């Protein structure tokens, strides 16, 4: 007799008539007048629970089985048989049911067997993975992460672990969380009366990273093809469905690559992971299509077969100015495109994923390569129908004199980036990369509208519970 996941039973990987044990939690219990009870038992290995048929001849039937409620944990042993009921092919004829944990008060159990609002579930984030929705999100999140690792491994990339604590501001935006062990009640001061960070743990001002890119570039300039994948932090006071203070970023970096090279890489990567999630998480994706967003599966299938459009920022602005549509945010050359502009381009004009390239330098970061016109940089955004920007990237500035001039323009002290500048002093190469916000990717795949519901424990302004 072997312990098996529920998924193996339901998906036919266990022979009929074999004795198995499944371990999980009760989703529902139904009692029949014929002297049977039906337990729906789930263990998170797949979307559906397995049905266990319990005969009233079991010694603990009256004392325990009939008291089981949603959320109780059980170990069920029995024979796998073809199911007589609708909805699943196999069930378990139980020979024993061991109760390992009771729900203290079924009437006050926060995850009682009913539908809960998504807002309520955020208040009980420690229990919400027990729901159909968040359980499905968690499995899709896992599958997407595994597919990303697999894709880059197959493409010859190395995964590099970049630091979460940094002294550099990659984006130059200044919206960073400070890391300090100084006594807030007794801060050391220098001669100017400012906080003396020389006395701090790292001997300088330190922050949680907003991006692993700068560190990633150092390894790309030695290993040629690398990617980073981990948490990043933004101290943006944004309470929107698209923002988190802590989120995951995937950032590949490729030596000897130009902007077009990484645009092609981004397209291949997205199509690869979308194909993987449709194949490997068919049951969860069916749930999203039925209960969350009826277009969830079709959207990914269209994306996989679509030819990506490409357009220069300047031409994109012209398209938007001449489309005859009234936008909430004005459009003119030099403005950063808003979500409504991006979605118009992808959904209404091109009706396909689109790569917008060569943005005005004044709205982009210091490290992006200055184009020959002196006004634009080799930057790109990948826009997807249904969400807008899903990837942002650029060719990096490999010319030291141009990089220094850009830093000066933006008021950055080049000495703070001495190690980053060294890459341009010792065997510089053209190189390019992009960033993918992992939670936005999951939201796009599942149709879940708010990124707070696709990360286990969302960190947002005034919320760091759990």
From Swiss-Prot:
A Gene Ontology biological process term: asparaginyl-tRNA aminoacylation
Principal localisation: cytoplasm
Reactions that this protein is recorded to catalyse: tRNA(Asn) + L-asparagine + ATP = L-asparaginyl-tRNA(Asn) + AMP + diphosphate + H(+)
UniProt-listed Gene3D superfamilies: Bira Bifunctional Protein, Domain 2, Nucleic acid-binding proteins
Family statement drawn from the similarity comment of this UniProt entry: Belongs to the class-II aminoacyl-tRNA synthetase family.
Cited PANTHER family: ASPARAGINE--TRNA LIGASE, MITOCHONDRIAL-RELATED (PTHR22594:SF34), ASPARTYL/LYSYL-TRNA SYNTHETASE (PTHR22594)
Name assigned to this protein: Asparagine--tRNA ligase
Gene behind this protein: asnS
